[in-house]
A protein has these predicted regions:
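Helix-turn-helix DNA-binding elements, focusing on the entry/boundary residues of the two helices
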Residues: 41, 52, 63, 78-81
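Flexible coil/turn residues that form the inter-helical turn or adjacent wing/linker of helix-turn-helix
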Residues: 37, 48, 77
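N-terminal flexible/basic segments that precede or flank functional cores
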Residues: 1-39, 102-111
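Short, conserved catalytic or interaction motifs in soluble domains
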Residues: 71, 96
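Membrane-proximal amphipathic alpha-helices
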Residues: 68, 75-77, 83
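Short alpha-helical DNA-recognition segment
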Residues: 49-68
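The alpha-helix within a helix-turn-helix
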Residues: 45, 56, 85
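DNA major-groove recognition helix of helix-turn-helix/homeodomain DNA-binding modules
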Residues: 60, 79-95
């Protein structure tokens, strides 16, 4: 059997009608949202050509905090979201649905 035919234990159980406990599904959703936010920060920072240290200076944070945010290791608060949006010169859009989450930074147009 080659690797393309392997299935994760979770996939096999799902195929047999097993479903994860609600707590596991909720935790998985939280991880997906944290990863979506981390990716949005990273992508916008790269679009602006900023280093983590430069973004940290703009946001009044430490480089280590930016690293934790981009590594999905920080729980963002509303003040942190505001600081990052301002530092990234963008509006932050978060769409929460039952089957997906989307986090994007939209560049502010020059006025």
């Amino acid at each position: 059997m080659n690797h393309t035919r392997w299935k994760l234990d979770r996939e096999r159980r799902a195929a047999q009608g097993y479903s994860e406990p609600a707590e596991a599904e909720a935790e998985r959703a939280e991880v997906r949202l944290a990863m979506a936010f981390a990716k949005a920060v990273y992508d916008r920072r790269k679009d602006l050509g900023l280093s983590q240290a430069e973004l940290a200076a703009r946001a009044g944070l430490t480089q280590a905090k930016i690293s934790r945010v981009e590594g999905a290791d920080a729980v963002p608060t509303l003040p942190l979201l505001r600081r990052l949006a301002h530092a990234l010169d963008a509006s932050l859009n978060i769409a929460l649905g039952t089957d997906h989450e989307e986090v994007t930074f939209v560049a502010r147009s020059a006025a």
